[in-house]
Each structure stands twice: as structure tokens, then as C-alpha cells.
Amino acid sequence: MTVYKQRFVLDTTAFTDRGVVDELGDGDLCEAVTRLLDLIGRARMELAISCYIPYPTVYRELKGFLERNGCPELLSRIDTWIVKKTPNRYEVKVPARLFMAYVKDMRERLDRGRKRAEKAIWEAALEAYEIMLREEADVPKERIIREVIGETVRRFRRKYRQTVRHGTLDSAPDLDVLLLAKELDAAVVASDEGIERWARELGLRFMPACSFPDMIEEYLRMSREVEG
């Protein structure tokens, strides 16, 4: 039987997505990664499906996740079943139109982030002023820092991240996933709105991380039926 050799480039979220961890590991990241590697290994041996991970950027991210969750020994299995490759950043061509669109998108996001910062400053100043008006005695500096500045900074960080980083490419690993997929004519596997959006812009196939294990299992099941 002739098998079309499919290629997939995996982002860190292909392993750490909450849906994947719950489905394959019942909430345990190490168990989920183990079972996903089992599927990837079988798919490679039986169907000639190849999975890649950008090196060193995404590989380093994934290594950190495994070490923090107490299963660094899984790196040897990742080295066995997943191809580590550095994207050819000098040869992969990206249309100038997409580059301009990305710059425009980031400029708009930074502008919205600046407005968020200005609003946070005004809110903090107003809250501090209202506290001092309510109190007849001098207000301790520590109280202003605790009740006003600290809370304002926490709110600002959350809103700034959502405004500037959510839904776009905000790191070198994200970009490497797309560049490697384009270089290899491979599908992207991730659970990241920014990667998904720009994968579409580049004309790349995209597979949600939560759907990837089921797809591999279906391929394996159908292969057994055809051969049997």
C-alpha cells in the first residue's frame, strides 16, 4: 500500500494543551506526553508520518516544561521519535505583504497597549488621591503601594498581555514553528491563536493540538483495517 508521507511541525502547546493533557494523561502532563509519544512512534513506524520540532527554541521550551513537571527523562524519547531541526531562516521566503501586515498589526497593538498604560496611571493617581481625601491623617506610603499601585500593576499586566500579545506571534519559538512548517511543507500542530492565525496567512495546514492525537489514532485504525 502506498502511503502519503505526512509531516507535522509541533509547537510546545501540542504537548501542553489542557485538552491533550486531560484526554491522554487524565490531568498529568508527563503521562500525556508519554502517550502522545507512543502514538507518534507508532505513526512513524507504521505510516511513515514524521513529526518535527524547531531546535533549539521550541525544544528548549518543551524541555523546561518536562523538567518543571518532574519527567526530564522523556527528552530521550522525544529525541528518538521527533526530528529536531533548525528552520532555514535565510532561505525560507515570506511574502512582503505578510511582513507589512504583521508590522501594522503590532503597531496597532502597541498603540492600544500605550493607551492601557495611560489609563492605568490615571486610575492609580485617582485612587491614591481619593484615599488621601478620606483620611484626615497622613496616609502611610506602604498603604498606597499595597492598595493602589500593587493592584493597578496587576490589572495592567493582565490587560496589557491580552491587548498586545494575545492572538499574534510574540516569541521566537512561535515564528520558528511557522518557518519550519513552510520550509518542509508540513502541517502545524499547536494550541495558540497567534500561530493559527499566521499559519492561515502563510497558507499552511493547521491542526489544533487537541485534535492531533485523535487524528493519529484514526490513521492507525484505518491502516489496520485496510491491511487486514
UniProtKB/Swiss-Prot annotation:
HAMAP family: RNA_free_RNase_P
Top EC class for this record: hydrolase
Biological-process GO terms, alphabetical: tRNA 5'-leader removal
NCBIfam families on file: PRK04358.1-4 (NF003343), RNA_lig_partner (TIGR03875)
Keywords attached to this entry: Endonuclease, Hydrolase, Nuclease, tRNA processing
Reactions listed under catalytic activity: Endonucleolytic cleavage of RNA, removing 5'-extranucleotides from tRNA precursor
Organism: Methanopyrus kandleri (strain AV19 / DSM 6324 / JCM 9639 / NBRC 100938)
Signal peptide range in chain numbering: none
Protein name: RNA-free ribonuclease P
Family stated for the protein in its record: Belongs to the HARP family.
Record function comment: RNA-free RNase P that catalyzes the removal of the 5'-leader sequence from pre-tRNA to produce the mature 5'-terminus.
Family matches, as Pfam families: PIN_5
Cross-referenced InterPro entries: RNA_free_RNase_P
CDD domains with a match to the protein in the record: PIN_VapC-like
Keyword Nuclease: yes
EC number: 3.1.26.5
Keyword Hydrolase recorded: yes
GO molecular-function terms, A-Z: ribonuclease P activity
